[in-house]
């Protein structure tokens, strides 16, 4: 390439695009590299090629929607129990992304979106199910807490911030964000406070339900490119929420009494006794859930109508919690064993220890969510001491350790010396 001369018509000193061969006088801009030049027209052509490749790869991914059986199989690897809920979710998610894969094809029938409502007690796996689903489909996924949401204009988190978080999870790729999954937790906390009209505005209850209606049904949300507050001179990213799958979850405390009253199966007093004595009764009652029960609970009809797929989850009993501790691919016991393995120490749990941990979670009514905190409390002293101890090859946790009546058993490599097993 030659330099531009001061003289007017010397073609030897004119710069040319290294790709298309056009001179600097035939294009608007010529960008110089270390040894090459590229014009603005070639840059635009390259961008068009990249966009087409992105579209074609997206079409391929849409056609590769896993079957309900495949989704269920992966859920079984990570989530223990909840067979009915997993079947409902597998079919709903498969149909949703199958709908996206074929919506561009000519069809007289428009397939509506089916958002999902998960109803189940605390710690039964609602959030974990949604997270696992997003991992299976490989789409952007975010969690939002309904208790922090308020109507636009009030102190609190705006509903449109949900879309902003999803866009951030997709690295500001609008196309990917528009096919993502949003999980809204604690949705039962935005129920209408009472059936009676009030002179004060319910900005965190019914008002939030009204605000969520638009984005759940499908609207074009204007989101600031890098977050922050909106102002008139700012350019916005337009995100269409029509194809975003919304999954709402909540414990719905007290909903079982509404369902029981509708069925006239028990008296109010007897129903309360059953709830306190037999926790599994709650999960069984939830199986009889009807939309009218959600209306009585405090959800508005329009909001319930946006959640046509309802999956109910059961309480986790001791046996299920023991399975959760040991069987999934990322089970808690396996996680702590991996931590101890980094210190070249084998961590062993006796069967009675696992059942004692599960019993504590049932007593505390925290479900699977409380298992980690119980494990942390049991292993805290051991994890504190272990890095400074020499020769320990095995740590054994028994049921007495969980109950607090004994310390973990330390087995040393050279001498079969034991530290622990001493009354606390």
From Swiss-Prot:
UniProt cross-references to Pfam families, sorted A to Z: AAA_2, ClpB_D2-small, zf-C4_ClpX
GO biological process, one term: proteolysis involved in protein catabolic process
Occurrences of domain ClpX-type ZB (ranges): 5-58
Molecular function terms, GO-annotated: ATP binding; ATP hydrolysis activity; ATP-dependent protein folding chaperone; protein dimerization activity; unfolded protein binding; zinc ion binding
Residues at which Zn(2+) binds: 17, 20, 39, 42
Keywords: ATP-binding, Chaperone, Metal-binding, Nucleotide-binding, Zinc
Keyword Glycoprotein: no
Recorded GO CC terms: HslUV protease complex
Gene3D superfamilies to which the protein is assigned, alphabetical: 1.10.8.60, ClpX chaperone, C4-type zinc finger domain (6.20.220.10), P-loop containing nucleotide triphosphate hydrolases (3.40.50.300)
Keyword match Chaperone: yes
UniProt-annotated binding residues for ATP: 121-128
Subunit structure: Component of the ClpX-ClpP complex. Forms a hexameric ring that, in the presence of ATP, binds to fourteen ClpP subunits assembled into a disk-like structure with a central cavity, resembling the structure of eukaryotic proteasomes.
NCBIfam families with a match to the protein in the record: clpX (TIGR00382), PRK05342.1 (NF003745)
Role this protein plays: ATP-dependent specificity component of the Clp protease. It directs the protease to specific substrates. Can perform chaperone functions in the absence of ClpP.
Family: Belongs to the ClpX chaperone family.
Matches recorded under PANTHER family: ATP-DEPENDENT CLP PROTEASE ATP-BINDING SUBUNIT CLPX-LIKE, MITOCHONDRIAL, ATP-DEPENDENT CLP PROTEASE ATP-BINDING SUBUNIT CLPX-LIKE, MITOCHONDRIAL-RELATED
Protein name: ATP-dependent Clp protease ATP-binding subunit ClpX
Organism (species): Brucella suis (strain ATCC 23445 / NCTC 10510)
Gene encoding the protein: clpX
């Amino acid at each position: 390439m030659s330099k531009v001369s001061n003289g007017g018509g010397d073609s030897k000193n004119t710069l040319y695009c290294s790709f298309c061969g056009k001179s600097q006088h035939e294009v608007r801009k010529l960008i110089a590299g270390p040894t090459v030049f590229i014009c603005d027209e070639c840059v635009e052509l390259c961008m068009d090629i990249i966009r087409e490749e992105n579209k074609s790869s997206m079409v391929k991914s849409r056609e590769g929607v896993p079957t309900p059986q495949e989704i269920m199989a992966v859920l079984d690897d990570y989530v223990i129990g909840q067979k009915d809920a997993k079947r409902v979710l597998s079919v709903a998610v498969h149909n949703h992304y199958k709908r996206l894969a074929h919506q561009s094809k000519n069809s007289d029938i428009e397939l509506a979106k089916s958002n999902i409502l998960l109803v189940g007690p605390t710690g039964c796996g609602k959030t974990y199910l949604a997270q696992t689903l997003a991992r299976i489909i490989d789409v952007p996924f975010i969690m939002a807490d309904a208790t922090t949401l308020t109507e636009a204009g009030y102190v609190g988190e705006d509903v449109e911030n949900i879309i902003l978080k999803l866009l951030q999870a997709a690295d500001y790729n609008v196309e990917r964000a528009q096919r993502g999954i949003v999980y809204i937790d604690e949705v039962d906390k935005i129920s209408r406070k009472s059936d009676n009209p009030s002179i004060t505005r319910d900005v965190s209850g019914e008002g939030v339900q009204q605000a969520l209606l638009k984005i759940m049904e499908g609207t074009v949300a204007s989101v600031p490119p890098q977050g922050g507050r909106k102002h008139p001179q700012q350019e916005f990213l337009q995100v269409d929420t029509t194809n975003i799958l919304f999954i709402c979850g909540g414990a719905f405390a007290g909903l079982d009494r509404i369902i029981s009253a509708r069925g006239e199966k028990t008296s109010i007093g007897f129903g309360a006794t059953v709830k306190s004595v037999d926790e599994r009764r709650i999960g069984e009652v939830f199986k009889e859930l009807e939309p009218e029960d959600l209306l009585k609970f405090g959800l508005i009809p329009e909001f319930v109508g946006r959640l046509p797929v309802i999956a109910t989850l059961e309480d986790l009993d001791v046996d299920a919690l023991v399975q959760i501790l040991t069987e999934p691919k990322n089970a808690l016991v396996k996680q702590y064993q991996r931590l101890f393995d980094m210190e070249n120490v084998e961590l062993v749990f006796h069967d009675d220890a696992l059942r004692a941990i599960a019993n504590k979670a049932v007593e505390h009514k925290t479900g699977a969510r409380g298992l980690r905190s119980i494990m942390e409390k049991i292993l805290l002293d051991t994890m504190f001491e272990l890095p400074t101890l020499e020769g320990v090859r095995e740590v054994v946790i028994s049921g007495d350790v969980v109950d607090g009546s004994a310390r973990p058993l330390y087995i040393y490599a050279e001498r079969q010396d034991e530290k622990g097993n001493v009354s606390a």
